[in-house]
């Protein structure tokens, strides 16, 4: 199976393969199997850099005038301690299966590292960092009056959710992962879990959207607003609310409201979560961008929504989305959760987090943004070590403040 997939991946990612497209390029057995193997631990360093050759996409157009970030000429080095052992930067990069690392401090790039064949033009999958992007778009739509209130019920914008698990839930509930919908987010895609069912039908076989599942099959488990339950389904429904409220494709709205005015350097793109004729942006986990543009996005949020001299995102929204009262998400889970941003205990720091250890880590106290793009064998579990590294970077800058 691995040999067959390697051969398929090579053919998919080669320039010659793009010249001979079949009549239905996204639903051939080869393409379906390619999407089915995207998390393969021996090849995810490659697939995570080439999602547009495995999935149907929608492009988010960049600015013609990029936001220039000065680059520090001095070499960057840092060490950190984890579980009683101290590691150098190079050891961290290898130990945590790093594809790319960017560190911005005081509006300047102080470290920019590419690995595993990637470069400044590579567009990396965000996985669930996309939730923080979708939240940002919701905030902009709210400021424009396209969404009247985040306390509006989901069914006001998506009447097809009447009678589903989302009836009675509000936009705020979805932003905070408290919809009350019965959903179990377990990343074992070879086992018959709820997430596997929706993932395989939406992202692999292209049979229906995440929002189709939400409307037709979701069920209520708890009262909305009462219990934190991390859910890519909630974030996907948020994206469907967004596109319905603004009356535009999500990619076009993002280009117009964020990617162009913020001075992003290169086009980004969303992978699609359904069949080609009706599929739309996979708002829960499907954005792709360059390392620097992820850094620009994090820097914009650090700046209170400001980018290259322009106020792109309302500052009040940024404060609400990333701050507030820190409340742990559960027993043994010290991180909190605001509007699709994770918060850090005893700190003003917050972060966007994606599967297989993708991070945009923002520390307001030291004016630092860290982007870490990975291809770890395990989908989750290494966050404590990453937080130890981020803490060491922040401590390094705190000494120079």
Language-model segments: which ranges?
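Catalytic-site signature segments of enzymes, centered on catalytic residues
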Residues: 114, 120-121, 186-188, 196-275
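Active-site helix/loop module of the DD-peptidase/beta-lactamase fold
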Residues: 125, 144-186, 219, 244-284, ...
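Active-site SXXK
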Residues: 107, 125-150, 174, 238-242, ...
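Active-site-proximal loop and beta-strand segments within enzyme catalytic domains
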Residues: 78-92, 108, 119-121, 141-227
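Active-site-proximal alpha-helical segments within enzyme catalytic domains
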Residues: 234-241, 285-306, 358-374
